[in-house]
Amino acid sequence: MALFRALYIIWVFLLIPLSNAEEFTPKVTRTLSRYVFDIVNFDDSNTLIRAEEDSVEISFDAGENWKTIDEIEEPIESFVVDPFRGHDRAFAFVKTAPKFYVTDDQGKSWRPLTIPISEKASNYFCDVTTHPIKKKHLIIRCDLLTIKNSGLMYVGREIYTTNDGVSFSQVKPSFGKIDGHISTARCDFIKSSEDSDLGGNDASILCLFRNTEYIESTGSTIDKSELILSADGGETFKELVQFKDKVVSRYEILKHHVIVLTQDDMYNEMSSTNIWISNDVSTFQVARTPTKIRHVNMGQIHEDSIGRIVLPVSRERDDEDSNQPGAAEVLISDSEGLKFLPINWIPNNQFGYINVAYPGFLKGTFFGSFHPFIEYSDRKRKYSRQKVREETKVSVDNGLTWTNLKVVDRENVDLFGCDVTKPERCSLQTHFYDLRNLNPSAGIMMISGIVGDGSAYNWKEEKTFISRDSGLTWRLVHNSTGLYTTGDLGNIIMYIPYRSNENGDVPSKFYYSLDQGKTWGEYDLIMPIYPYRLVSTISDGSGSKFILTGTSITEDPIFITYSIDFSAVFDYKSCEEGDFEDWNLADGKCVNGAKYKYRRRKQDAQCLVKKAFKDLSLDETPCNSCTGSDYECSFEFVRDAKGDCIPDYNLIALSDICDKSKGKSVLVKPLQLIKGDKCKTPMKIESVDIPCDEIPKEGSSDKEIVTTENKFDFEIKFYQYFDTVADESLVMLNSIGDAYISHDGGQTIKRFDTDGEKIVEIVFNPYFNSSAYLFGSKGNIFLTHDRGYSFMIAKLPEARQLGMPLDFSAKAQDTFIYYGGKNCESILSPECHAVAYLTKDGGETFTEMLDNAIHCEFAGTLFKYPSNDDMVMCQVKEKFSQTRSLVSSTDFFQDDRKTVFENIIGYLSTGGYIIVAVPHEDNELRAYVTNDGAEFTEAKFPYDEDIGKQDAFTILGSEEGSIFLHLATNLESGHDFGNLLKSNSNGTSFVTLEHAVNRNTFGYVDFEKVQGLEGIIITNIVSNSEKVGENKEDEQLKTKITFNDGSDWNFLKPPKKDSEGKKFPCDSVSLDKCSLHLHGYTERKDIRDTYSSGSALGMMFGVGNVGDRLLPYEECSTFLTTDGGETWTEVKKGPHQWEYGDHGGVLVLVPENAETDSISYSTDFGKTWKDYKFCGDKVLVKDIITVPRDSALRFLLFGEAKNMGSGSFRTYTIDFRNIFERQCEFDITGRKRADFKYSPLGSRTGCLFGHKTEFLRKTDEKCFIGNIPLSEFSRNVKNCPCTRQDFECDYNFYKASDGTCKLVKGLSSANGADICKKEPDLIEYYDSSGYRKIPLSTCKGGLKLDAHLAPHPCPGKEKAFREKYSINTGAYALVFVTILLVIFFVAWFVYDRGIRRNGGFSRFEEIRLGDDGLIENNRTDRVVNIIVRLGLCISLITKSAFQRAKAGTAQLSSKFRARFGNKKGATYSSLLHDQLSDEPDGFHEDSNDLSSFRGQGSNSEIEQEDVDTSQQEHTLRTDLLGASNIPDALPARSASHESDLAAARSEDK
């Protein structure tokens, strides 16, 4: 019984604390408002401020009573409480004026301050930055919102510094007025906190201004910036010289460091970033990162307890509407802040985003969570979850080791779906969002999360957990999620759920704990609330008062504020010494070389601490012996997979250890003590001998080139970049189906995790450059629309994969067609057939669109003017048949299906055309073309004696309104060739450009248009085609080039000397016997390896030789042109692979089919070359690539190291960025000095395609170009008069040896009436002149070879034609009769008043001039008599002249008969007969004599000021070069033209 009584007493005493806590009720005060959504509170006080509609109110009793602040008269935009003086000072900014109010006594009094902004605005958005020590120093920043005349909103940013409002000083950039283009205007005090190492006690200010100029014509931007520093509180500023020529994007001021980010490319806001670090604000150094950084989450940068910088890195998504978090990784610097490395536990083969939280009050403690990129949707979809795991970890030793979050909760073990005793498989998973604003405490914290293995994260299953040991172990406290906060250093915990139950009801109570989460009480609120904010009134979490804000659930919501006061708990008792215990940080282990412990209240103590967190002493005991955790790798070293520090070649090259060494090697310690570490006895570190033989010396450009090597066990078979300027992302696929993704040009590569599913094919969307599709072997398709940062997984239809490519809509990113096999248990089964499946939602759902379809096109999205925007065309191959048909539909074959052709060979689309190959009789083909999807027209090929049957043709592309086509004329395997044809604008009428153009058995043709330049094409012809066709000789290839889109061709002009300065063996003047020949398209391993680049204008590489024919590949050398093919230079002996970078500013060559350890590069457009050794052992380089736009400075090499076992396949990323001193300056207006100038290409300073064009080229090789779209800024100096080179031969005409277009014998010209069918509104057409203008030409006036002759009526329009050109007899008759009547009346009047009245005609010869015998009674009589006298005078003179002429003629006639009377000869009629007896089709032969066109006004539109003799002469010379030895042959009308032509002919000779 005594024992029972004792136990009872003990139980009573244990119950007392709980009963006391249950009996306590916090003081809760409610405040309602209709206009305020937030309430501002002063630290550790009952004073609250809120803004009503027209007034500002204050409460000094936690919201029980409110009164209006009379000093504040205007509407307030915002309140700001001074973060360093939160107990007393606050600012209230006025919305409608540049004005704010200040209180220094917790709102009891306010004083106004007016900002001296002169510009008027409708709204002002201002904020303030205060100094942590100097109270009177303020920085004011205002955004001005005004409405301009155009109605557009304009934001101007202005910054002022002030000494407590006594005076204001505006801060301005030096580059001009702050306007709407200013994207950044920011100033901050260097000293960011009271314990900051920077700035001392002064008021130094750092300011950044950044201006962004938008180039509307190209869609690009130009950025400029200015970073300035003031050491006198804002009175004077000076620019930081180190950043003078750089674009500073942002900066961040931390406790120990200032971080400045500079944009690598001022013309690309998405370009990579350099990170500059300083600890004294005077000297900045570039930090080393694993790869180039593009997007940094500046607001989340912080320092850990030893001063290391934690740098979150993200990327921007292309889809602005997506709510998916941005991709990210977290880098942590060394203790010097100069070398960054990623967190070591993050999966290196998975893409996702990372959250890292660092509670600053817990030294050495980090929380991290990794979340794979998977898009979620509430809609039902056929997405399977990508099996990549969530991971959540904690570290208590500064990130050296990490562990899972262990759940220790025996009472609730049944609530978890896994065994929590095995934390490696079952642990707490969370996102750690709430830890960023965690209130300080001695290891007490709460988070929301779920318990599992990380394979799934269901937000609906989230619960709330608590930890008392800084996150090492956790316990469940609530089965829901909500808002929580702590007070009194963790001894008071408040929690309110977002929903009170599973039905989603609004919470009507909150929960609280007074024993660090062990037990919980609850409080019923007067009014339910949608909670959105729960905070302690003291920022460091040491107070006992809280503010809860939210909205009501009424139809007309009102804002609710609850003020909650726990200060009376435990009868206001404060803790004494016996109420505390020691709590060891990190379980008592050494952190930063010391052991740390806090004194915290015991869990069941009945008291409050009532002290600020900073007043709690953190006991620090240095550790005696240093261990490996106290060290980090020296700058030149990195940790390997085992954790050992090993030398890094790139870091050694960046450091100066070898520059300082006098020998061939240098001794370096691989470990260095972490800066600020407290351990007493250092470890003994053995130095490592680093060879310096291959390390580039200081001043060498090779020192600045950075190479990164990656090793693979299997060969990379496929690789392709995403064609965007956002970054350098690419996808690679190896020989066993593993996919890899890189976002930095191959520098860092991650394997794409498919949970064991092999990738069998990768397809890129040709219309949306950020999209790609990876086909899995198990029926999944992995889709990305953001360059591989995130993927969705779609389940393909239940059909066999046939390996057929997807077909995409050109206008809808999520719409494409997939082809699968039905009834294909065996691919050889006769029932196996293809089915086209359509998706419009990016793969969420597929519908069966068309059975037996093997190729479809979204035709309505391809044409410029489609007959129907929704039109789809499909090629259908029926089961048990080899026949293929072409069908179309405008509703995806639901109800509409139309057969276009019953039998086709195939079809394709190019440049706004669809071309169908249709079988014809006698095993021939016919081509039909459409440019609207409705009307198909047969393509008319020219008659030619060397064209037999139309057996095969290749579409080579379509540009500028013409289709280029290769029509095979010889199909014998290994000896294929044919004619190169070009169409008219609608693709239906073709003319021959060149004969015997080489092709291979696969249909590929040696044809390449030079990218970026108009009308330049290179082909290889079979020079001995006749003998090859007769099987008498092997092919002999020669290379030809055209500069006017195929109208004229010539051989390539060879260089005079080779790369070694020696003359070539052949030096004939005739290009037919000695020219440059290049291997072409038919021999390429990768068809993407073109001669030219669209961004390196005028530059082309080629492998070939100088001679009379093309030699085998291995016997050739490498040649370069920089003027579009006019002149060439041999740059290297032997075949090389090439690549362009920086728009041609960097050229790179690597030997082909030979092992090497070096590349050759040029930064002066190929004038000089340097070698760079990129690896230690020689490798066979399979390919060299860069971004499709050739604008990057990074190149990626794929190599194979022979006989090296595992990892013999390598990639090398070579970065040239650092060899350039700066970025080239470009001024679009041309008003300022820039590093570019306009110049013509080569010596072709005359006209080409009817205009003179100049191109931009950089002038300084020390600068790099970047993302300037140079090709967009080429300019046409002027349009030119038309010449022969602006025309090509029309259909059924061919170019003769004299340069004229002649009609093919036996044929007639194109039927001009065909145009009447295409344009029904026409009433007339014209016959062909034999010439047609080249579509690219813009010439005006001059020669008019295509001039039309007499018009003909269109069939059926004869009446309209006659009406247009016939005379209107009725109208003309009326006019004629009217004129006759007028003449008759005048004549009668003159006769009656002037002749008859004065005696009639009998006196006619008696009247003399001046005779007064005529009757003149009035003015009318005088006028009539004057007319009579004038008529008499004229008649006498005419009569006299006639008589004299008659007499002279009679005399000449008699003399002529006397001299020639007996001679006979041809009469005029016989001469006329000879003219008219010419052959009937002689009209067409007029095309043979171009003089007939000269009379049509060849110079009719040339103005005197446009005539430049030197340019005209040069134009003629250029024409002759383009047309070999063909003279222009145009007889001129003027002496100047005759002299020009004479000069041309003499030069031709």
Swiss-Prot record:
<feature type="signal peptide">
    <location>
        <begin position="1"/>
        <end position="21"/>
    </location>
</feature>
<keyword id="KW-0472">Membrane</keyword>
<feature type="compositionally biased region" description="Basic and acidic residues">
    <location>
        <begin position="1535"/>
        <end position="1549"/>
    </location>
</feature>
<feature type="repeat" description="BNR 3">
    <location>
        <begin position="159"/>
        <end position="170"/>
    </location>
</feature>
<dbReference type="InterPro" id="IPR015943">
    <property type="entry name" value="WD40/YVTN_repeat-like_dom_sf"/>
</dbReference>
<keyword id="KW-0675">Receptor</keyword>
<dbReference type="GO" id="GO:0016020">
    <property type="term" value="C:membrane"/>
</dbReference>
<dbReference type="GO" id="GO:0010008">
    <property type="term" value="C:endosome membrane"/>
</dbReference>
<dbReference type="GO" id="GO:0005794">
    <property type="term" value="C:Golgi apparatus"/>
</dbReference>
<dbReference type="InterPro" id="IPR006581">
    <property type="entry name" value="VPS10"/>
</dbReference>
<feature type="repeat" description="BNR 7">
    <location>
        <begin position="511"/>
        <end position="522"/>
    </location>
</feature>
<comment type="similarity">
    <text>Belongs to the VPS10-related sortilin family.</text>
</comment>
<dbReference type="GO" id="GO:0006623">
    <property type="term" value="P:protein targeting to vacuole"/>
</dbReference>
<keyword id="KW-0325">Glycoprotein</keyword>
<feature type="repeat" description="BNR 1">
    <location>
        <begin position="57"/>
        <end position="68"/>
    </location>
</feature>
<feature type="repeat" description="BNR 5">
    <location>
        <begin position="393"/>
        <end position="404"/>
    </location>
</feature>
<feature type="repeat" description="BNR 2">
    <location>
        <begin position="101"/>
        <end position="112"/>
    </location>
</feature>
<keyword id="KW-1133">Transmembrane helix</keyword>
<dbReference type="GO" id="GO:0005048">
    <property type="term" value="F:signal sequence binding"/>
</dbReference>
<keyword id="KW-0967">Endosome</keyword>
<dbReference type="GO" id="GO:0000166">
    <property type="term" value="F:nucleotide binding"/>
</dbReference>
<keyword id="KW-0653">Protein transport</keyword>
<feature type="repeat" description="BNR 11">
    <location>
        <begin position="1119"/>
        <end position="1130"/>
    </location>
</feature>
<feature type="transmembrane region" description="Helical">
    <location>
        <begin position="1370"/>
        <end position="1390"/>
    </location>
</feature>
<keyword id="KW-0677">Repeat</keyword>
<feature type="topological domain" description="Lumenal">
    <location>
        <begin position="22"/>
        <end position="1369"/>
    </location>
</feature>
<feature type="repeat" description="BNR 10">
    <location>
        <begin position="1040"/>
        <end position="1051"/>
    </location>
</feature>
<feature type="topological domain" description="Cytoplasmic">
    <location>
        <begin position="1391"/>
        <end position="1549"/>
    </location>
</feature>
<keyword id="KW-0333">Golgi apparatus</keyword>
<dbReference type="Pfam" id="PF15901">
    <property type="entry name" value="Sortilin_C"/>
</dbReference>
<keyword id="KW-0813">Transport</keyword>
<protein>
    <recommendedName>
        <fullName>VPS10 homolog 1</fullName>
    </recommendedName>
</protein>
<dbReference type="GO" id="GO:0006895">
    <property type="term" value="P:Golgi to endosome transport"/>
</dbReference>
<dbReference type="GO" id="GO:0005829">
    <property type="term" value="C:cytosol"/>
</dbReference>
<dbReference type="GO" id="GO:0005768">
    <property type="term" value="C:endosome"/>
</dbReference>
<feature type="glycosylation site" description="N-linked (GlcNAc...) asparagine">
    <location>
        <position position="769"/>
    </location>
</feature>
<keyword id="KW-0812">Transmembrane</keyword>
<keyword id="KW-0732">Signal</keyword>
<dbReference type="Pfam" id="PF15902">
    <property type="entry name" value="Sortilin-Vps10"/>
</dbReference>
<comment type="function">
    <text>Functions as a sorting receptor in the Golgi compartment required for the intracellular sorting and delivery of soluble vacuolar proteins, like carboxypeptidase Y (CPY) and proteinase A.</text>
</comment>
<feature type="region of interest" description="Disordered">
    <location>
        <begin position="1479"/>
        <end position="1549"/>
    </location>
</feature>
<feature type="repeat" description="BNR 9">
    <location>
        <begin position="837"/>
        <end position="848"/>
    </location>
</feature>
